[in-house]
């Protein structure tokens, strides 16, 4: 277990298109995500919604305008399992809360931590979007993080921002706050062990299920309690 507790950075809504994902969030929370931009390396793009306390919500989708690698090389797999046929089949039914991202705060160095524990933490990828740069743990095949074969979006991706400025600091206030992040997983004991090791167990309420893995986020909004799943 790490001695450094992680912080919740953001939640991830996956969608076939940004418009579909934006509409899903707006219909549920009463405010539409905006801003964001493109991730050239991953060939994805996003929109963001500010939440209380330095946390935000990300809607992410494959960017149909993304350029292929200039050197003719094969593009790398997209993050958050967006290239996975199972994910794409699910997105045909609509956007959903697919994942969450936990922040590694300095002085701890995400890259050094991953080098020390490569079986526990996926390879670190440098990312950019506009003026923001950061490091992100992304398996080479673009899958969700996993431990002993269990993941399914319930284990967090790890992020470390390169500058003190965080995206939430430049997003409009919404009056929306995350109340609780919950998950169910058929291998909850394996998931719990990895969350404990990461120092992230305090960020999510985990229960066992005989069914499929799933995430649920509860929000306090000006119109009352709302849920994304």
Region roles according to the model:
Residues 37, 50, 56-61, 82-92, ...:
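Vicinal oxygen chelate
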Residues 13-15, 104-105, 181-188:
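Short, surface-exposed ligand-recognition loops at beta-strand->loop->(often short) alpha-helix junctions
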Residues 20, 24-27, 68, 150, ...:
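Phosphate-end processing signature that detects enzymes handling 5′-triphosphorylated RNA
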Residues 2-18, 31:
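Hydrophobic, proline/glycine-rich low-complexity stretches
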Residues 20-85:
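Glycine/small-residue-rich interface belts in oligomeric ring/scaffold proteins
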Residues 20-23, 106-113, 188-193:
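Short, conserved charged micro-motifs
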Residues 8, 97-98:
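Eukaryotic phosphotyrosine signaling hubs
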């Amino acid at each position: 277990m790490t001695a450094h507790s992680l912080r919740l950075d953001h939640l991830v809504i996956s969608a076939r298109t940004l418009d579909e994902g934006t509409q899903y969030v707006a219909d549920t929370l009463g405010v539409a995500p905006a801003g964001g931009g493109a991730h050239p390396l991953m060939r994805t793009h996003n929109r963001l919604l500010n939440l209380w306390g330095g946390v935000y919500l990300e809607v992410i989708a494959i960017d149909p305008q993304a350029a292929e690698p200039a050197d003719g090389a094969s593009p790398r797999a997209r993050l958050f399992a967006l290239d996975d046929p199972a994910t794409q089949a699910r997105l045909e039914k609509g956007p959903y809360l697919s994942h969450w991202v936990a922040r590694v705060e300095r002085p701890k160095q995400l890259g050094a931590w991953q080098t020390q524990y490569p079986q526990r933490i996926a390879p670190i990828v440098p990312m950019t979007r506009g003026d923001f740069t950061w490091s992100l743990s992304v398996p080479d095949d673009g899958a969700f993080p996993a431990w002993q074969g269990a993941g399914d979006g319930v284990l967090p991706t790890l992020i470390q921002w390169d500058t003190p400025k965080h995206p939430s600091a430049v997003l409009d206030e919404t009056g929306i706050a995350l109340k609780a992040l919950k998950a169910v997983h058929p291998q909850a004991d394996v998931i719990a062990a990895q969350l404990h090791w990461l120092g992230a167990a305090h960020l999510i309420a985990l229960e066992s299920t005989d069914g499929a893995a799933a995430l649920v986020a509860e929000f306090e909004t000006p119109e009352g309690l709302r849920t994304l799943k």
